[in-house]
């Protein structure tokens, strides 16, 4: 199986963060679920959890506070 490029990994992270921020803007942070983010990003739960274990980790990555 070929390795996934760093560019692909970064693009996928940005896709998930963008989807999360759209959900947060619509529903607020606490009411937004990881499933909402998965749906908005058009990805499976497994794909999203591969990059981020929680909503908090998405925010930390977006804010560069990890």
Each predicted region: which residue ranges?
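Short hydrophobic/aromatic patch on the recognition helix
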Residues: 42-52
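DNA-binding alpha-helical recognition surfaces that contact promoter or target DNA
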Residues: 36, 50, 60-61
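Residues within the helices of the helix-turn-helix
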Residues: 4, 35, 46
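Alpha-helical structural segments
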Residues: 11, 15-22, 26, 40, ...
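A short, mixed-charge helix-start or loop-turn motif at secondary-structure junctions
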Residues: 1-5, 52
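Ser/Thr-centered, proline-biased regulatory motifs
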Residues: 30-39, 56
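Conserved hydrophobic/aromatic packing and binding residues within compact polymer-binding modules
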Residues: 16, 37, 48
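Short helix/strand-capping hinge loops at secondary-structure junctions
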Residues: 23-32, 52
């Amino acid at each position: 199986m070929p390795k996934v490029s760093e560019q692909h990994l970064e693009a996928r992270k940005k896709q998930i963060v963008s989807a999360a921020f759209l959900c947060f803007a619509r529903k607020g942070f606490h009411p937004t679920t990881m499933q909402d983010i998965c749906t908005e990003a058009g990805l499976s739960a497994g794909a999203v959890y591969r990059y981020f274990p929680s909503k908090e980790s998405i925010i930390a990555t977006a804010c560069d506070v990890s």
